[in-house]
Curated annotation (Swiss-Prot):
Name this polypeptide is given: Ribosomal RNA large subunit methyltransferase I
Family: Belongs to the methyltransferase superfamily. RlmI family.
Function: Specifically methylates the cytosine at position 1962 (m5C1962) of 23S rRNA.
Keywords: Cytoplasm, Methyltransferase, RNA-binding, rRNA processing, S-adenosyl-L-methionine, Transferase
PROSITE patterns with a match to the protein in the record: PUA
UniProt xrefs under CDD domains: AdoMet_MTases, PUA_RlmI, RlmI_M_like
GO molecular function terms attached to this record: RNA binding; rRNA (cytosine) methyltransferase activity
SMART domains: PUA
Coiled coil: none
Length: 397
């Protein structure tokens, strides 16, 4: 017997606007068997009108994630094939436009597959299954991937803390095909990047910053550039390609720095114009300030500072401090390219934090360009939560 979920009166409004979440407080009653973790359930308004079909997650505040608003649509292999083909149509356009062999294929709710992200690196599909429903449908998803991409291997990188909120353990490994090699080389905008699928950050690389990396090129010609939290050198590669006189790449991970150097060499870029510094960014910026060392461009792309609302206040403090330090080591007329990937921090709050940092740094700052996540991380019109990456180009007087 199919389980039916009835909502509290008035809580159906968001679903009628096709928002894909139902929170625990929005559920009035459950009819039928008690749903198991990840089970597909039918969602009705308080009067019994069918609204959606979704996955039930008993341990999450997001109790139901909607698979479909079409009553005729069954959640099976064909369903996933249909979603994959729809997503691929957009990526085909982007891949041709930007010369991509690596991109986000599925951006979770924004591509109609809540709790599922899939990145493609050449012939490897790297999945993160972040919800109970995604875990329940894993076999159907992998079968659909094998149908749509028979040339590809499928690898799981569900080693993220958010799975704990769903009552799931972290998991990695081959789901079909071959084990990834040490590096898979992708290309974007004419730049080659070596990606560590098994051990790298996220699924191996920060694909969402592609458009920002390309935008950085116009600010760096002949400039001395500091690339903070450089990981495997993404922004630094674009800076060297854009004619920077020097790029100082900074990260706390020596393996990441080693890969950044490898990427620099692989692109035939002038390694003699690049430095690779293993250091804590906060400490290093203070050292630069104390000894009066200045840069023309500072790129500030830190990791997520806020994983939950309880961490937001501390995150705001961290973002303000690090942007203040960056401004203090910029030459007059310098450029700060600064970003936040914390979804809990909206664009307005981040802009205020940067403005507060300018006051503390005693520098006049003008916002001259805004940035967001790359186009293969689309924002669905019914799902504003899909917007998480924001950034600014700041002219620092």
């Amino acid at each position: 017997m199919t389980t039916s979920i009835y909502l509290v009166k008035g809580r159906e409004k968001s679903l009628r606007r096709r928002h894909p979440w139902v929170f625990s407080r929005g559920i009035d009653r459950i009819e039928g068997n008690k749903p198991s973790m990840g089970e597909t359930v039918e969602v009705y308004d308080n009067k019994g009108e069918w609204l959606a079909r979704g996955a039930y997650s008993p341990q999450s505040q997001i109790r139901i994630r909607v698979w479909t608003f079409d009553k005729k649509e069954v959640i099976n292999v064909d369903f996933f094939v249909k979603r994959l083909k729809a997503a691929q149509a957009l990526r085909d356009v982007l891949a041709a436009r930007d010369g991509l062999t690596g991109y986000r294929l599925i951006a979770a709710e924004s591509d109609g597959l809540p709790g599922i992200t899939i990145d493609r690196y050449q012939n490897f599909l790297v999945c993160q299954l972040l919800s109970a429903g995604a875990e329940e449908q894993k076999d159907a998803l992998v079968e659909a991937l094998n149908i749509c991409y028979p040339e590809c291997s499928v690898y799981e990188r569900s080693d993220v803390a958010v799975r704990k909120k769903e009552g799931l353990k972290q998991r990695t490994g081959v789901l079909s095909g071959e084990e990834p090699p040490k590096f898979v080389t992708i290309e974007e905008n004419g730049i080659k990047i070596n990606v560590d699928i098994v051990g790298g950050h996220k699924t191996g690389f920060y694909l969402d910053q592609r458009d920002s990396r390309q935008a950085a090129v116009k600010y760096v010609n002949g400039k001395r550039v500091l690339n903070c939290f450089c990981y495997t050198g993404g922004f630094g590669l674009y800076a060297l390609k854009g004619g920077a006189s020097q790029v100082v790449n900074v990260d706390v991970s020596q393996p990441a720095l080693d890969t950044a150097r490898l990427n620099t060499e692989a692109n035939g870029l002038p390694v003699e114009n690049a430095e690779f510094v293993n250091a804590d960014v906060f400490k290093l910026l203070r050292e630069y300030r104390e000894r009066g060392e200045f840069f023309d461009v500072v790129i500030m792309d830190p990791p997520k500072f806020a994983e939950s609302k309880s961490q937001l206040v501390g995150a705001c403090r961290g973002y303000k401090d690090i942007n203040m330090l960056a401004m203090q080591i910029l030459n007059p007329g310098g450029i700060l390219l600064t970003y936040s990937c914390s979804g809990l921090m909206d664009n307005g709050l981040f802009q205020k934090i940067v403005a507060d940092a300018a006051l503390d740094a005693h520098r006049e700052v003008q916002f001259i360009e805004r940035f967001g996540q790359a186009a293969d991380h689309p924002l669905d019109s019914a799902y504003p939560e899909g917007f998480y990456l924001k950034g600014f180009a700041c002219y620092v007087k």
